[in-house]
C-alpha cells in the first residue's frame, strides 16, 4: 500500500496554481505511461520496486550520509550548525538519489535507452553512473557554457561510456539543455526514458524526483532525533530547479511519498523553518530590453508562467519571454524553479532568500578553510545564507555536493573579484 500523504500526486500533479502537464501532444502518451509507472512502482511498491531502490542506494550509493557538527561555523554564528553530507554520496552529490531511482524505474518499464540534461554536470555524472551500473545506454545534453566550466564532469560522464552532446543554442546553459533533451525524448519516445534532474517539468516528474530525493530528509529527521534529541530549528538548502531543496525539505512538509520510511518520518513539522537560497548573481531584477537577468532568483523575483511542461515562477520579460539567467554556480543557473517549491513559498511554508556571487565565493573558501569541507558552489550559497539566519536553535545546512568540479571557476572568479582565494601557486621546474 502507498504511504502517500499528498493527494495531488494522484491527480494532475498541481500544487496550488502551479504544476500540471503542459506538453506537446506527441509526448502525452509517454507522460501518461510514466504517470502510471510512478503510481504503480514508486507509490505502491509494485514488484518490490522501492525495496530494490532502497537496497541499491545503500549498497551502490553509500547511504545513509552523515550529519556532522560544524564547530567553527557554530562559533561564528552563535548557534549549533550541522552539515547534512550529501557530498559523501557516491558521485559527490545528492543527484544519485534521483538518477538511480529513475534509471531503475526505466528498467522496470522495459525502456532500453536513457537521455538526460545536466547543468553543473553532477546530474549527468550520476545518470551516467547509474546507467553503467544498470547496463543502460546513456546520452547527456549539456549547454556549451557549462561544458566549458565543468570539464571534469564531462570527462567523468564519458568515462562511464555516456555520450555527451554540447548544446550551442541560446546561452548554452541548463534551460537549453532541457529543451534539447525534450526534443530527443519526443523523437524516441517508444524506447527512451528522460531522466529529468530536478523537481521541474510536467507531472509526474516534480513529485517523483522529490520522492527519490526525500531520502535526504528522511535520514535527517532520524539523525536529528538521535544526535540532537530534537528536530532542527531550521534547514537551509540552495535552490536552483529545486531537487536538493525538496530532498532536504520533503519529509518536513509532509508531501514526500516513498514507501518504507520509518513511521512518522513524513509527518509535517511546521516548527522547522525551511530556507531556500537562490542565486542572487550580481544583482536582482530582469532587464527586459536585453532579455537578461543577472541572477537566478525565480522564487524571490519571478512571475508566473509555463516552462518545460509546468506552470511555475520564472524569470521572464513583461511579455512572457524567458530570459537568460546568471549564477557563478552552473547548477543554480536556471530561469525557473519547481512548481511545488513555488507553491510552498506562496503559502509561507518555505522562506526564499538569495545570496550573490561574491558571498557564495567567500563561503566556499570559509567552509573549506574552517571545516575541511570543500563545498560545491551551489552549496556555498546555502552556507553564505547562515549570515541571514537569526534563530537560536540548531540549524542544518544541506551540503548538496562537493566542490572539486568548481575549482577552476572559483580560482578565476575569486581573482576577478579580488576575493581571498587559494594561496598563490608556484610551478617548480626541474
UniProtKB/Swiss-Prot annotation:
InterPro entries on file: Trp_synth_b_CS, Trp_synth_beta, Trp_synth_beta/beta-like, TrpB-like_PALP, TrpB-like_PALP_sf
EC class name: lyase
Q: How does it assemble?
A: Tetramer of two alpha and two beta chains.
What's this chain's function? The beta subunit is responsible for the synthesis of L-tryptophan from indole and L-serine.
Q: Which family does it belong to?
A: Belongs to the TrpB family.
State the Pfam families in the record. Answer: PALP (PF00291)
GO terms under biological process: L-tryptophan biosynthetic process
Q: Which UniProt keywords apply?
A: Amino-acid biosynthesis, Aromatic amino acid biosynthesis, Lyase, Pyridoxal phosphate, Tryptophan biosynthesis
- What Enzyme Commission number(s) appear in the record? 4.2.1.20
Q: Which terms in the Gene Ontology molecular function aspect does this entry carry?
A: tryptophan synthase activity
Q: Provide the protein name.
A: Tryptophan synthase beta chain
GO CC annotations? cytoplasm
